[in-house]
UniProtKB/Swiss-Prot annotation:
A cellular-component GO term for this protein: ribonucleoprotein complex
InterPro entries xref list: Ribosomal_eL30-like_sf, Ribosomal_eL8/eL30/eS12/Gad45, Ribosomal_eS12, Ribosomal_eS12_CS
Name of the protein described by the UniProt record: Small ribosomal subunit protein eS12
Pfam families per the UniProt record, alphabetical: Ribosomal_L7Ae
UniProt keyword Ribonucleoprotein, yes or no: yes
UniProt organism field: Oreochromis niloticus (Nile tilapia)
Family, per entry: Belongs to the eukaryotic ribosomal protein eS12 family.
Gene Ontology molecular-function annotations: structural constituent of ribosome
GO biological process: translation
Family annotation (SUPFAM superfamilies): L30e-like (SSF55315)
Keyword Ribosomal protein tagged: yes
Key words, A-Z: Ribonucleoprotein, Ribosomal protein
Amino acid sequence: MAEEGSPAGGVMDVNTALPEVLKTALIHDGLAPGIREAAKALDKRQAHLCVLAANCDEPMYVKLVEALCAEHQINLIKVDDNKKLGEWVGLCKIDREGKPRKVVGCSCVVVKDYGKESQAKDVIEEYFKSKK
């Protein structure tokens, strides 16, 4: 738990790198949130990375996304909560204290453009290299 709060100083793991990669991609307009946008990006082979919420309530969404990722050899990461994923990709309002509120759940998001090189991006890429 201690390393989670200090990604700049210590070694970054996938769970701390993923939100950072998604935020950077959001800033550089490189995200395709939602099943329709994600499916289009996956089908056109524009995706570098796909993130799927494990608590997605529609099993056919999960099947479609997993099949497209497998067919086009696109890396897939599953996160446990669609509200958390929605917050990471900017589907929320930020209040005065900087806390997210009115978070909308997001079942699937595709990273089409990482935006810029970063340590977080390298951590994600190393994670997939080690899985192969």
